[in-house]
């Protein structure tokens, strides 16, 4: 929090080799997750960025300037990312116990494990579309849809509640 963007970039470059950065403004204090990036964007590989359509991002309350930055972002080689879009749920999410949450669900918050990809599902018609799209990105892993409606009521999804440990 006390670092400038330039100082952060120097450290990230030194320890992780990052050469290109995508700085988004976000919306601090926004309900649900304060605009955590894992709810609306994920790198599938070095050339592909998984996100939502511009309209869905606006509905998700992502600032318009951040959408432009995301859609125009470049990878480490300076090439534009191939944008792969996942839908929001068709309907606002209702928990298994009937609580209406008043907002739609994102599929971007999936978790990539060694042999599987765990995808948030919401008992919604778009679950199948999201699962198939994600399966096409990870052909050597099995996509498993996990019903997250009750978890989502507390502001989290699969990626939020897992603790990744890279090999």
Regions found by a protein language model. Give the residues of each.
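Histidine/cysteine-enriched polar flanking segments
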Residues: 1-167
């Amino acid at each position: 929090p006390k670092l400038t963007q330039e100082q952060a970039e120097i450290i990230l470059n030194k320890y992780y080799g990052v050469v290109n950065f995508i700085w988004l403004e976000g919306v601090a204090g926004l309900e649900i997750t304060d605009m955590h990036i894992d709810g609306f964007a994920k790198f599938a590989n070095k050339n592909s960025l998984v996100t939502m359509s511009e309209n869905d991002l606006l509905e998700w309350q992502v600032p318009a300037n951040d959408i432009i930055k995301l859609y125009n972002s470049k990878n480490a080689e300076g090439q534009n990312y191939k944008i792969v879009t996942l839908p929001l749920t068709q309907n606002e999410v209702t928990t298994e116990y009937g609580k209406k949450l008043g907002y739609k669900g994102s599929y971007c918050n999936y978790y990539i494990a060694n042999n599987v990809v765990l995808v948030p599902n919401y008992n919604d018609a778009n679950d199948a579309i999201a699962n198939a799209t994600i399966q096409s990105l990870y052909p050597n892993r099995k996509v498993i849809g996990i019903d997250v409606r009750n978890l989502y009521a507390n502001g989290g999804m699969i990626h939020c509640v897992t603790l990744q440990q890279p090999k």
